[in-house]
Swiss-Prot record:
It is found in: Cytoplasm. Keywords: Cytoplasm, Elongation factor, Protein biosynthesis. PANTHER family: ELONGATION FACTOR TS, ELONGATION FACTOR TS, MITOCHONDRIAL. It comes from the Bacteria. Gene3D superfamilies: 1.10.286.20, DNA helicase RuvA subunit, C-terminal domain, Elongation factor Ts, dimerisation domain. Its main location: cytoplasm. The gene is tsf. This is Elongation factor Ts. SUPFAM superfamilies: Elongation factor Ts (EF-Ts), dimerisation domain (SSF54713), UBA-like (SSF46934).
Amino acid sequence: MSEISAQLVKKLRDLTDVGMMDCKKALVEVAGDLQKAIDFLREKGLSKAAKKADRIASEGVVALEVAPDFKSAVMVEINSETDFVAKNEGFKELVKKTLETIKVHNAHTREELLKSSLDNKPFEEYLHSQIAVIGENILVRKIANSKAPSSHIINGYAHSNARVGVLITMKYNNEKNAPKAVELARNIAMHAAAMKPQVLDCKDFSLDFVKKETLVLIAEIEKDNEEAKRLGKPLKNIPTFGSRIELSDEVLAHQKKVFEDELKEQGKPEKIWDKIVLGKMERFIADNTLIDQRLTLLGQFYVMDDKKTIAQVIADYSKELNDTLEITEYVRFELGEGIEKKAENFAEEVALQMK
């Protein structure tokens, strides 16, 4: 076999982005055949990537791209092991190519993305090659691919720290109001990025979830009331319910009668009941929908006007525009949400803090 030239090693390095020594070893292994050396390194890279895939990837980025006409958008969460790698130019290029691949192949799931192609090879193979080159486990964890039907727009917001992204799809009736819908969707996406609503509406909750969360909520309020009582401050009302989905017509009718009976017993004139009962019912609903106010986008109070819920803000816009605006889809990604670090990593962090 002829000696492996420096030019050939450099060419292989340029083609594969693998270190010079590994390139030379690969060329020696395959007797200087460039294509076989590329295949050899790919196989070697895949082997390394498989080992790296056992590591926990909880850093990375959330990135999104909204089409200029606001009729489509894609969003992705890509995890790496360290924040340092997430700032690497190679990693940024991977994120860019991932978003483009989702658009080109119209992928709607992670599985569809991995089976699609990029640069004439499977995307999954491309991802493994990047794991080998970058040197960390990299995971495409979530993707979103939204298309706006007629009379809908999509807008979004990605936080500057690249850790949170939100997409909002909004419906309108009059095409002239599309720009206003775009503006409102952007503002609501910014709200959602900050306030972390879990779902769009209380209808997305299961009854079991609401009942469990209500018990937790009551325990919190009772604890707060103990402290308030000690300090001589007003006590909070203890709710019976947690969400609007529990407030059936029967429940509301019963509560209204309770208030009317109280007014009758107090000797209040019947002609003023309606106004008093209306206020009491509004307070009852507010006190018994606290889970909605915490966890639903429509039920949360707007960060730019904390006197109004998001639902009320949308209603006000609709009235102003003489239209009916409605959020039809809400997607929020937060980097590493639900990923737990290994116990030993946490123990090491605690130990370091105690030194």
